[in-house]
Amino acid sequence: MKPPILIIILSTVISGTMIVLTSSHWLLTWIGFEMNMLAIIPILMKKFNPRAMEASTKYFLTQATASMLLMMGIIINLLYSGQWTVSKNLHPMASTMMTIAMTMKLGLAPFHFWVPEVTQGIPLSSGMILLTWQKIAPLSVLYQISPSINTNLLMTMATMSVLIGGWGGLNQTQLRKILAYSSIAHMGWMVAIMTYNPTVMILNLMMYIMMTLTSFMLFIHTSATTTLSLSHTWNKTPLITSFILVLMLSLGGLPPLSGFIPKWMIIQELTKNEMIILPTLLAITALLNLYFYMRLTYATALTMFPSTNNMKMKWQFERTKKMALLPPLIIISTMLLPLTPMMSILD
């Protein structure tokens, strides 16, 4: 894709999200989502092959259905309230329709089927945008309507998402699919806290974006797409591979690393609201995520993958991809836990 075209498309994606974030009118919010969806499709189809075409079509159909449901929710709200203003007091039926539309856009269970398939069919750079930037707009709408959302509906979806995000990733060897299932689980954690403390949800989203962004940047740097190709990067770039493995554990929520902060805070908030069963269930199912990340780390770091290739050293030309953002992102994604006492300002 030529640079001017790419700049125009990326700026449309960004402006679409910004319109959703800043608008106080439902029609403008809907237009922002449509701009964002239509601009992201050329980015997904950057590598023009059948798999990318299929992934883009799946993405388009899902997002178009979600936009239709959103517009239906907006119209129902308009009929009952007579106003287009984005407000916290929505009609219950309109609120349910909008919640389902946003969860479809986010890829929460039971509307999660498109996420792994689309992520697997597109390049790493497109997957990075899909699993980070594209989550901001739907979550901002959920944040704005959080007081009128049906808590039981959201909690059911959250629990299912964390379960499916854990189970789905167990037998995967493709790194993009592993990150897609991880995304489903993280979205589950975010919507679990939505109706109780939306500020913690924003903190969780920031941490998730930092960790996923860093993971994708490191995968792009090493050109790793499978667990086998990741295990071969030990010989080529041992330092970067070790960073990837620590990041994987952080994404799984292992305590000394940054990924533990949002899970800790969400469990704390839920128990403050006298909920015991749900945070226990979320904590247990989060172990599934941690298990497949630990298994990936163990297999890559301490064992040799079965491979027909006897020569483990990859041919490599003298080229380095300059990524100035990587060092600070790696530090934030792994070493933020000591700063947790400062989080008390959120209360």
Swiss-Prot record:
Its top-level enzyme class, in one word, is translocase
Q: Name one GO molecular function term.
A: NADH dehydrogenase (ubiquinone) activity
Q: Does the keyword Transport apply?
A: yes
Which coarse location class describes where this protein primarily resides? mitochondrion
Question: According to its UniProt record, what is one Pfam family this protein matches?
Answer: NADH_dehy_S2_C
The record's catalysed reaction(s) read: a ubiquinone + NADH + 5 H(+)(in) = a ubiquinol + NAD(+) + 4 H(+)(out)
**Cellular component aspect of the GO annotation:** mitochondrial inner membrane
Q: Where are the transmembrane segments?
A: 3-23, 25-45, 59-79, 93-115, 149-169, 178-198, 200-220, 242-262, 274-294, 323-343
E.C. number: 7.1.1.2
Localisation per UniProt entry:
Mitochondrion inner membrane
Summarize the protein's role.
Answer: Core subunit of the mitochondrial membrane respiratory chain NADH dehydrogenase (Complex I) which catalyzes electron transfer from NADH through the respiratory chain, using ubiquinone as an electron acceptor. Essential for the catalytic activity and assembly of complex I.
Complex and partners: Core subunit of respiratory chain NADH dehydrogenase (Complex I) which is composed of 45 different subunits. Interacts with TMEM242.
The identity of this protein, by name, is NADH-ubiquinone oxidoreductase chain 2
Organism annotation: Nandinia binotata (African palm civet)
